[in-house]
Amino acid sequence: MANILKKIYDNDRRELKKFEKLATKVESLGDEYEKLSDEQLQAKTPEFRKRLKNGETLDDILPEAFATAREGAKRVLGLYPFRVQIIGGIALHYGNIAEMMTGEGKTLTATLPVYLNALTGKGVHVVTVNEYLSSRDESEMGQLYKWLGLSVGLNLNSMSADEKRDAYNCDVTYSTNSELGFDYLRDNMVVYKDQMVQRPLNYAIIDEVDSILIDEARTPLIISGQAEQANSEYIRADRFVKTLVEDKSDDDVDDDEDHGDYKIDWPTKTINLTNQGIKKACEHFGLKNLYDIDNQVLVHHIDQALRANYIMLKDIDYVVQNGEVMIVDSFTGRVMEGRRYSDGLHQAIEAKEGVKIQEESKTQATITYQNFFRMYKKLAGMTGTAKTEEEEFREIYNMEVITIPTNRPIARKDLPDILYPTLDSKFEAVVKEIKERHAKGQPVLVGTVAIESSERLSQMLNQAGIPHAVLNAKNHAKEAEIIMNAGQRGAVTIATNMAGRGTDIKLGPGVKELGGLAVIGTERHESRRIDNQLRGRSGRQGDPGVTRFYLSLEDDLMKRFGGDRVKLFLDRISDNDDDKVIESRMITKQVESAQKRVEGNNYDTRKQTLQYDDVMRTQREIIYGERMQVISEDKSLKPVLMPMIKRTIDHQIDMYTQGDKKDWRNDQIRDFISSAITDEETTKKLNMKHLSAEELKKRLYQIAEDNYAEKEKQLADPEQMLEFEKVVILRVVDERWTDHIDAMDQLRQSISLRGYGQLNPLVEYQESGYRMFEEMISNIEFDATRLFMKAQIRQNISR
């Protein structure tokens, strides 16, 4: 362990040395650039762009570009980045995390790598945790970029698609993390390419990177829509299906006649309408062609009603309890609480059983921040606290944490923790300390872990007659204002879990002489990082300050991980002695080792989440890639559709022609051909009994080719044909992908229940997920084949 730590430390030093050399180069250009006129300095931007076009790299022009942005900042913002800020900027350019203490000017530091990377014209995203900070930074720092000839955009939740597109087309775009993620998902749901708003993800600098990539890492972004099927549709389909008769005739009976309306193939648990059944459906619903493109939703309902009524067996596959359909686990025979079949099958069973059909919202697209931000070509981040999570940043995001030295030595005093036996005695002591410091005018910031603690403390301060402000993360703009005033003489501010990150606490007049800002933590958070954030609010830029944590044996963390040694202290304190107090570095160490254990557990959970998510990520990339190919195509999708049709023919014919010819499942073959490839008349003329499986496939390929040619003739305009092809593929892909997301979610929930025996749940999930994905692709190809081959051509199709 010691060796690993030494290696990390040495690597940190080595990187820092390299960055310091570069910073010296940047500083050495300072005098020369100071002498340039505004016009000459502004002319640097087109000059750099030209040099990049001619083959120079960003690394080649870094010293000059940084010197340009630095001099520009002095002229436009009245701020001149210090040497440590240049080093921080270099760390960011190389895709690292710059750990910079609060008040060291992270926002200004970012301007240097943002300017350099924006010169490529491929876009730089500056990512913040809320829209207030995005707007603030865009209006303040944006002045500098605009002055240097770059375009700057702000991406807000309230904007229209056109406004968003304009923002993303800028050289520099300010946005929140959630808006970036949702825009990415929405872009992969559009049906026309010009509806997309984002460009390829190039370079992002994330402010408060630990908050976004670690605290919110497991939060999935989800776009969901009400499942569009109305309940009445399930009932309509159910009523129709209940009138049908099963065709139980043997496949050996070769009379080309249907002996019922539907046929079940029990080995594969598939069920299909026969030609007789298709005719009945057309009569029942008043249709000319059941498989026309407009009837896709109805066909889906009929398919599910058939499965619900004739394949899914009551008291074997499911039970009905208290008016609800409950799934039975085929492995254990137990009822699975809260689980539902996906793809509308559950509603179809509810219709069959005459119970209330439950509305369902459907996840249409989803991604986690972990997977979204890993798609950027280059990623960097800034925060005051990342070192404790260094391993996670390296392993998951391939980013090193570089601790940037402070501009001035730290003068803050971090006092040892104080431990009280009870919550009451602890809060009384906190109020006493606030009172003493407030009496002499020293500003106090009190950090609490939970809102209820802040309310309790606020009540006690009211009783003590101490005016104070309470902060919780509801109103970001108001929050910033309160935090800005927290360093004024006599200010007392209570903040929950570091609301107000990203806003500096500057000391008011005469506060330095009083000892700077006093920070009091009312309990330790389970993450050291959050505690360090609270501490870091005091002592900015070499200011004086003091911090201390007050703990009690009734605190959550102490109860969970207090350790035996702390309990010994408790025994020494008699029951009635509430005033007994322990102040010791040992307590601090004990708490920190408890925090390390929690952090380790949390990291393992996030890592596991990512391993599961990676299965979905691979699948999402394939589907989104295919979708993009479809909406970007400007000539013909025949090279995509025709192979789909051929693979469907191969798959279906292979499935039903195994073994000797006498074992062929002729009824199923006929049903497939007449429902998905051609009409009943042509199916009869095929004379299958004289064909081998390969000959039959070739005949069907030819029918498909002829059908394609016929449709191309009907739609003489190639653009209309392309539009028709796109409609077919997009409708099918989107419907099947949405169902697949749902099914994968169900699988993930059930997989933990399967973790019996020696099975590894993750391996089970990967293998089942892969099989389900293959099945989905096969279903997409089947649906696209049926939809394309059976559709009637009309002029006014819409996607």
Curated annotation (Swiss-Prot):
Q: Which InterPro entries match?
A: Helicase_ATP-bd (IPR014001), Helicase_C-like (IPR001650), P-loop_NTPase (IPR027417), SecA (IPR000185), SecA_CS (IPR020937), SecA_DEAD (IPR011115), SecA_motor_DEAD (IPR014018), SecA_preprotein_X-link_dom (IPR011130)
* Pfam families, A to Z: P-loop_SecA, SecA_DEAD, SecA_PP_bind, SecA_SW
Q: What is its EC number?
A: 7.4.2.8
What name appears for this protein in its UniProt entry? Answer: Protein translocase subunit SecA 1
User: What GO terms fall under cellular component here?
Assistant: cell envelope Sec protein transport complex; cytosol; plasma membrane
Q: Name one GO biological process term.
A: protein import
* The family this protein is said to belong to: Belongs to the SecA family.
Q: What is the lineage of its organism?
A: Bacteria, Bacillati, Bacillota, Bacilli, Lactobacillales
Q: Which Gene3D superfamilies match?
A: Helical scaffold and wing domains of SecA, P-loop containing nucleotide triphosphate hydrolases, SecA, preprotein cross-linking domain
Q: Which PROSITE patterns match?
A: SECA, SECA_MOTOR_DEAD
Give the highest taxon in the source lineage: Bacteria
Q: How does this chain assemble?
A: Monomer and homodimer. Part of the essential Sec protein translocation apparatus which comprises SecA, SecYEG and auxiliary proteins SecDF. Other proteins may also be involved.
- Where ATP binds, per the record, is at 85, 103-107, 504
Extract the GO molecular function terms from the UniProt entry. Answer: ATP binding; protein-exporting ATPase activity
Q: Where in the cell is it found?
A: Cell membrane; Cytoplasm
Main location per UniProt? membrane
Q: Does the keyword Glycoprotein apply?
A: no
Provide the topology term for how it sits in the membrane. Peripheral membrane protein
Catalysed reaction(s)?
Answer: ATP + H2O + cellular proteinSide 1 = ADP + phosphate + cellular proteinSide 2
